[in-house]
Amino acid sequence: MTMKDITTALGELSDNLRTPFMLSYQGYKYEEISTHLKIPLGTVKVRIHNARKELMQKLEAYKFHDK
């Protein structure tokens, strides 16, 4: 798996998932993300969880594709 694979997988996420995930990755707290995006805290948590889950699935596919 390469950085290109990771970048591609991130690019395949919907904006609704990618934006809170990337803000979290950049060090913002969930509460800060909630305020910045003007969405409920629970929604932030669900979107980040779903983004992680989707990324893992996509990266697993790349891992098997490389073999």
Q: Where does each model-flagged region fall?
A:
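Acidic, proline/glycine-rich intrinsically disordered inter-domain spacer in sigma factors
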Residues: 1-11
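DNA-recognition helix of helix-turn-helix
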Residues: 37-61
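Short alpha-helical "packing" element that flanks the helix-turn-helix/winged-helix DNA-binding module
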Residues: 6, 20-21
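Helix-turn-helix DNA-binding module
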Residues: 11, 15-18, 26-43
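Short amphipathic alpha-helical elements of helix-turn-helix/winged-helix folds
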Residues: 9-12, 23, 58
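Intrinsically disordered, low-complexity basic tails/linkers immediately adjacent to helix-turn-helix/homeobox/MYB/SANT
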Residues: 65-67
